[in-house]
């Protein structure tokens, strides 16, 4: 009897711990994202060439990118609320569509910025790889949901949102580099751009595998006990 209660309580505790953990993660991401949006959009809120520097002649592409990106950063967390899709499926779908439109707008702005950028090839190619990864993860997520595969859709949209946050991750990595008094050369900047989405994806994949193992492992003792109980009687 005690083992049966323990077998039931353990998964409940695991789910509760998982929900609390994800809540902390999303709250932290929300705080960092809001700070990033206020800082970046505040910087370019005044039409001043000294604030825009090299983006002054390309401010149209810049604002296209920032406007679409702001939509995705703000709407992204709403899509991952546990009860949101079940309670408001139509609203969830429309919010997702607006998110996708925002992503396409941001990618259009990014394409214009990359095409007109005087930056070295390694930096432009790193930006292009980020945009391509962003679009690819969204496409795979869309294919999954059109096939009725909800779990893969959710996982791929999580990956997509981690790429959405790559500018914020890049900013954190760049500040860490400056704090270490290391010179931000073009090659270093390109490496940070790649790491800004590769590192979060690697961390997510590792955490996803660990959670899967934890979900499976409690079932093994129960199955073993079920198999051995007839013999013991």
Language-model-derived ranges and their functions:
Residues 2-233:
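Alpha-helical membrane insertion/targeting regions
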